[in-house]
UniProtKB/Swiss-Prot annotation:
Cell compartment(s), UniProt: Membrane
Name listed for the protein in its UniProt record: Cell number regulator 9
Annotated source species: Zea mays (Maize)
Classification via InterPro entries: PLAC_motif_containing
Tissues expressed in: Expressed in roots, coleoptiles, leaves and stalks.
Length: 175
């Protein structure tokens, strides 16, 4: 029923043979990707129709969307309220809120291993701020975060998922 074990005279020592993968499966419910995951954006810059509620929120109150993004990207060091307030003050008094938000796009790209768009992050935010913020928000959701809940709840969910899915013990059967 099971294939025979490789012969002891194998060219590779047992320590060099395939080792079990240790960690949390990314597809498990409630798991949050912790390390950088290199790849593409999960949605396009102009895919606002993918989430109409988010699109409306971002068009009418971009400070809320930005605050939620900033809290996740900063891993709780900056609260949604503080980031949103700074964004609003910059928008009202200088009109340069896009400079502040593009720095978070750059940081998010670096954390998640995402490629830069055909133009730099600041150009994306300057030309279409609502689209850029919506894309960032959708990406965080696609990566397992829920920006609506804030960093603390997302971190608790990740810790609970880690506790529920312990890594396999050494010495278990390997196929």
């Amino acid at each position: 029923m099971y294939p025979a074990k490789p012969a002891a005279s194998s060219s590779q020592p047992a320590a060099e043979m395939a080792q079990p993968v240790v960690g949390i499966p990314i597809s498990s419910p409630g798991a949050v990707a912790v390390g950088p995951v290199v790849g593409k954006w999960s949605s396009g810059l102009c895919a606002c129709s993918d989430d109409c509620g988010l699109c409306c929120l971002t068009c009418w109150c971009p400070c809320i969307t930005f605050g939620r993004i900033a809290e996740i990207v900063d891993r709780g060091a900056t609260s949604c309220g503080v980031a949103g307030t700074i964004y609003t003050l910059l928008a009202c008094f200088t009109g340069c809120h896009w400079i502040y938000s593009c720095t978070y796009r750059s940081r998010m790209r670096a954390q998640l291993g995402l490629p830069e768009a055909c133009c730099c992050d600041c150009c994306v935010h300057f030309c279409c701020e609502p689209c850029a913020l919506s894309q960032q928000y959708r990406e965080l959701k696609a990566r397992g975060f829920d920006p609506d809940l804030g960093w603390d709840v997302n971190a608790q969910k990740a810790a609970a998922a880690a506790a529920m899915y312990p890594p396999p013990a050494e010495g278990m059967m390997i196929r």
